[in-house]
Structure formats: C-alpha cells, structure tokens
Amino acid sequence: MRRWLRLLVGLGCCWVTLAHAGNPYEDDDYYYYREDEPRQHGEPNYVAPPARQFRFPPLNNVSSYQASCVVKDGVLDAVWRVQGTFYPEKGIVARVGWSGRRGRKWGRLHAPECLVETTEAVFRLRQWVPTDLDHLTLHLVPCTKCKPMWCQPRYHIRYFSYGNSVDNLRRLHYEYRHLELGVVIAICMAMVLLLGYVLARTVYRVSSAYYLRWHACVPQKCEKSLC
C-alpha cells in the first residue's frame, strides 16, 4: 500500500511540475504579433517576426536557416533562407507541409519557388492557407547525391484561426496540453488500479476455493472422516 501511495505522490509531483513548467517558447521568435492595421472583412492580419538563425547538427549538408512569415487576409507569404552546401546542377526537392488543430489536420501546400546557390538556397511561397493552420514545415533534400533523409527546417506560425488571440494560443498549445497529459496519466493510473483490484480479487477467490476444498474442516467433511 505504501508503494502505491509513493507512486501516486510521485506521479502527482511530476504532473504539477509539468503544468507549472511555463512556456518553453516564451523568448522565442516563433510567436507572431498582430499588425496595427485596420481589419479587413472582420479578420485581423498576422505577421511573424523574422526568426533567429537556428543551428542544428549537420544533416544532408544543411547547417542553419532563417525564416519569416506573413499571413494577411488568409494569404501566406513565407521565405526560408537555408545555409549549407548545395549542388544546383543536381537539382533540389522542396515541399511545404502544414498542420493544424494540434496535429489533427495536415496537408501540403504548393511547391515553393527555389533559388539555389552553392552555399545558400532561398525558398519563397505565396499561397492561400487554411484558417486552422498551426505551423509550417519546409521539407527539402539538398541534392540527389545525399542519402534520402529529409531535412526539416521548421517555422511555427502558432496560429489556429483569425479569431484567436496570443493568450488563447498559448493556452491551447501548452496549458491544455499539460491538462491532456494529466488526464491521460489519471486514466492510466485508474486502469492500473482497476486491473490490480480485479487480479487481486481473482487470486483471493481462487485461493479461498482451493483452501476450502482441500484444507478447511467443513462439517460434512469432518463427519465423514470421523465415521
């Protein structure tokens, strides 16, 4: 019993720690801000500030990238600048994917315009985007000589629909995610406890029946043995 209590207390502490961990992207440039322009057709415009230069381990000759994004009247204007080593004569494959509603919806946008040099590649995309857009991902393979592994310079727009504010987005992306995690942990714990209860009850019944059958002194059994 003490072990179960310790386990429950430990899981509760972990959940509280995750819930109060805060927003890991608080100081990140991923967050967009709202323009001080008048709304058109009742829909606000969104502009994503230029992303900082992100670095990650070399993969398919890509070293770093920068990204910027503007969503205005439902039209996306995005630019990716990817630094690395490229072979323009061999060509390059680039696709832009999107997802929304916390991963429940996804799709692919048009192929971006590519300007490839030996040390830098620029990808531009201008297209209408869904209103429940969550984030964009630029998938690219720098050259055909490289192994067929996808490089994914990501740029998160963090933008669900025109009516949501930044506070609502943070709540949807983080607080609600922690709440979902807590609910999942609680359901798993309840299932484990229920399974343990059923198993313990089954073992108790089987052992009781075995004991009564072979070891307990039942009146009929005792009378027969005395005869």
From Swiss-Prot:
Topological domain ranges for the Lumenal compartment: 22-178
Disulfide bonds: 69-151
Taxonomic source organism: Human cytomegalovirus (strain AD169) (HHV-5)
Name assigned to this protein: Unique short US8 glycoprotein
Gene Ontology, cellular component aspect: host cell endoplasmic reticulum membrane; host cell Golgi membrane; membrane
Keyword Transport: no
Taxonomy, superkingdom: Viruses
Main location class: host cell
Domain Ig-like H-type: 61-155
InterPro entries attached to this UniProt entry: CMV_US (IPR012536)
Signal peptide: 1-21
Pfam entry (one): CMV_US
Residues carrying covalently attached carbohydrate according to the record: 61
Cellular location(s): Host endoplasmic reticulum membrane; Host Golgi apparatus membrane
